[in-house]
Regions:
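Catalytic-site neighborhoods of secreted/periplasmic enzymes
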Residues: 1-89, 191, 284, 309
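Catalytic-adjacent loop/helix segments of enzymes that bind and process anionic phosphate/sulfate esters
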Residues: 10-26, 91-123
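C-terminal cap/loop subdomain of S1 sulfatases and analogous C-terminal strand-loop tails that border
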Residues: 18-50, 191-195, 199-216, 233-237, ...
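Histidine-centered active-site microenvironments of extracellular/periplasmic hydrolases
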Residues: 25-28, 35-36, 136-139, 145-155, ...
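Loop/turn elements at helix/coil->beta-strand transitions in domains of secreted/extracellular proteins
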Residues: 38-41, 119-126, 175-181, 222-223, ...
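Active-site His/acidic residue clusters
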Residues: 53-54, 58-62, 70, 107-154, ...
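Short glycine/proline-rich turn/loop motifs
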Residues: 81-92, 141-146, 228-232, 334-340
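The substrate-binding groove and active-site-proximal loops of carbohydrate-active enzymes
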Residues: 89-101, 145-158
Length: 344
């Protein structure tokens, strides 16, 4: 999204301190190069993750309320642990805890508006990047304490319920049998989830995987990928096919028999064959950590071009723990999914 700048003000793309510039934006002006500029008919959401300014809803190319206040939010209800979100422009009636239920409600309303046309063979596409369970971890009061574990677990339960609302709307509109639903994530679990508390109650968000969000390890990149497509994908089946989130583009294009231009989706490989039980086309995957360290996976083999996590877990980049470690890491994920034995 490209925001308009107030007359006489300047905004540098190279400035890494947002507070130096966020008040130079003219939030009353239309937003350029947003979702409506790249093919979406309607957009309702926020500008980024819920710990980033501005704190206001956006509908199509306009904010729904001017962010005239300078506020932040606790990263977690009832605790100072985790600190606060980035302070910045906030709409007067905006509350971070309202975002999840609002996006769920708006999604259900969108499905209801499209239902009649969808039943008449005019399909719709809904992309819902939820702001949860990303920080700030702020379930609404009716969900606080529900898990009996910690705020993150409460937030996960509320997120699950929001997904359930959307599936229930498809049921009510008699669209379930002809709708492809994909539930996935953009990264592995974050340490903000207080993983130790979860583990003490028998919950392990990353299972046997090493590392977490930001790392080069599988715990940072391997995420759930759940598909529901009645009549096309048998329930409770599992696939070992490698899938990258970039592959959704080519897959949807193949389903719609809509060829992609040569200069679009170059890194996208359709996984439609895998959905139908056949061998998938992707045999490799390139990923990188938050500090730009790269890894490539081919078959069971994974080569990480760094001696460390490349992210937030140990051994951290530049830490003395990396002294004497091999410059690269090689793992056989078929035998060592937890990446404990570097074969290099």
């Amino acid at each position: 999204m490209d925001w308009a700048v107030k007359p006489g003000a300047e905004v540098s793309e190279l400035n890494i301190e947002p507070r130096a510039q966020v008040f130079n934006v003219d939030y009353a002006q239309p937003i350029a190069n947003g979702p409506n500029s790249v093919g979406f008919d309607d957009y309702y959401g926020i500008a980024a993750s819920l710990d980033m300014v501005p704190y206001t809803f956006i509908e199509n190319d306009r904010v729904t309320a001017l962010p005239t206040e300078d506020r932040d939010f606790l990263m977690m209800y009832g605790r100072e642990q985790g600190g606060k979100t980035r302070k910045g422009p906030t709409a007067p009636k905006f509350h971070a805890a309202d975002v999840l239920p609002t996006l769920a409600r708006k999604s259900c309303e969108f499905i209801e508006r499209c239902a009649a046309a969808a039943r008449a063979d005019k399909p719709f596409f809904l992309y819902l990047p939820l702001a949860s369970p990303h920080t700030p971890i702020l379930p609404t009061p009716d969900w606080q304490g529900k898990s009996g574990i910690n705020p993150y677990a409460d937030f996960v339960m509320q997120t699950d319920a929001a997904v359930g609302q959307i599936l229930a709307t498809l049921d009510r509109q008699q669209l379930t049998g002809d709708t492809l639903v994909i539930l996935t994530s953009d990264n592995g679990c974050s340490p903000q989830a207080m993983v130790e508390e979860l583990a003490a109650h028998g919950h392990h968000p990353s299972g046997p995987l090493r590392g977490h969000k930001a790392d080069i390890f599988e715990g940072g990149h391997r995420v759930p990928f759940v598909v529901r497509w009645p009549g096309q994908v048998a329930a409770r089946t599992e696939s070992r096919q490698i899938v990258c989130l970039t592959d959704i583009l080519a897959t949807v294009a193949e389903i719609l028999a809509c060829p992609l231009p040569d200069d679009a989706g170059e890194d996208s490989i359709s996984f439609l064959p895998a959905l139908r039980g056949a061998e998938g086309k992707r045999d490799h995957l390139v990923s990188h950590s938050i500090n730009g360290s790269f890894a490539i996976r081919r078959g069971p083999w994974k080569l990480a071009l760094c001696p460390d996590s490349g992210g937030w877990s140990a051994p951290r980049p530049g830490n003395k723990q990396t002294a004497g470690l091999p410059r690269v890491q090689l793992y056989n994920l078929a035998d060592d999914l937890g990446e404990q034995h570097n074969l290099q």
